[in-house]
Regions:
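Amphipathic alpha-helical packing elements
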Residues: 3-37, 44
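Active-site and channel-lining beta-strand-loop segments
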Residues: 18-20, 191, 203-204
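Buried hydrophobic positions in well-ordered alpha/beta secondary-structure cores of metabolic enzymes
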Residues: 24, 140, 202-204
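Feature captures the catalytic cores and cofactor-binding loops of soluble hydro-lyases/lyases
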Residues: 34-200
Length: 205
C-alpha cells in the first residue's frame, strides 16, 4: 500500500509502450499535446471512442478562466474518500514512511511537472471539499506552466485564482470553508471523475 508506486503505475498502464516519467507515468510527447490543443472536444472524444474507451468524458464543470484554448496535459491523479479514523491513521503512517509532509493536496502538487493536470476525485464534496485555493493554485501554475486541475469537488479563493494567468481549474462547486474530513487513498492510482475513468498519465483535455 504505497502512494505513487512506480510498479503499480506501469502495471495499470501496460498498453503504453512509449517514454515514461521516473514515477512510471506514461509521457505522451509534447508534440501530441500541442496538436490536441488545436483540436475540438468532438475530435478528441472520437479518438477515445474509436478505441472503445466509452467512459472518457465528463462535463458539468465550472471553470476559473473562460478561454478559447483548451487546457491539455498529462494526468496526476488523486482519489479521496470521507474520513474514517482507522483508515486516516493508516494513510498518514504510509505517507510519513514515504517522506511526505503537509496536507494531502500538497503531497500531490509537490510532484507536479510541466504540462501536468491535477485530477482529483473528492466524491463531489462542496463544503469542506475545497481542494484548491489561491495559494495552491499559484503553485500549480508555477509547476505546470500552462496546466491546471480537474476537481470533482470544490475550490475556494475563486477571485484570487481568477487573477492567476495561464491556468485553468475545472471544478464542481465553490465554498469558503477549508478542506477537511477527507482521506487520500490513491495518488497516481485509478481515479473516477463522474462517469469517466482517469489513469495516471492520461491526456486531459
Amino acid at each position: 500500500m504505497q502512494f505513487n508506486n512506480r510498479d503499480d503505475i506501469i502495471q495499470m498502464t501496460s498498453y503504453w509502450t512509449g517514454e515514461r516519467f521516473p514515477d512510471g507515468r506514461p509521457r505522451v510527447s509534447d508534440s501530441v499535446l500541442e496538436r490536441l490543443r488545436n483540436m475540438s472536444i468532438e475530435e478528441v472524444w472520437r479518438l477515445a471512442w474509436m478505441k472503445l474507451n466509452n467512459y472518457q468524458f465528463q462535463g458539468e464543470f465550472k471553470c476559473t478562466h473562460n478561454t478559447q484554448k483548451p487546457t491539455v496535459g498529462r494526468a496526476v491523479t488523486a482519489t479521496f474518500v470521507p474520513i474514517r479514523e482507522d483508515l486516516e491513521l493508516a494513510m498518514m503512517r504510509q505517507a510519513k514512511s514515504q517522506g511526505m509532509k503537509g496536507m494531502y493536496n500538497q503531497w500531490v502538487v509537490d510532484g507536479l511537472v510541466e504540462d501536468d493536470v491535477f485530477v482529483a476525485d473528492l466524491f463531489d464534496k462542496t463544503e469542506y471539499g475545497t481542494l484548491v485555493g489561491g495559494n495552491l493554485a499559484t503553485v500549480i501554475r508555477q509547476k505546470t506552466k500552462r496546466g491546471g486541475a480537474v476537481v470533482w469537488g470544490s475550490i475556494r479563493d475563486l477571485q484570487q485564482i481568477r487573477e492567476i494567468e495561464d491556468i485553468n481549474i475545472f471544478y464542481r462547486g465553490f465554498h469558503p470553508s477549508p478542506i477537511r474530513d477527507i482521506t487520500l487513498v490513491g495518488y497516481n492510482a485509478p481515479c473516477r471523475i463522474g462517469h469517466a475513468t482517469c489513469l495516471p498519465g492520461d491526456v486531459v483535455y
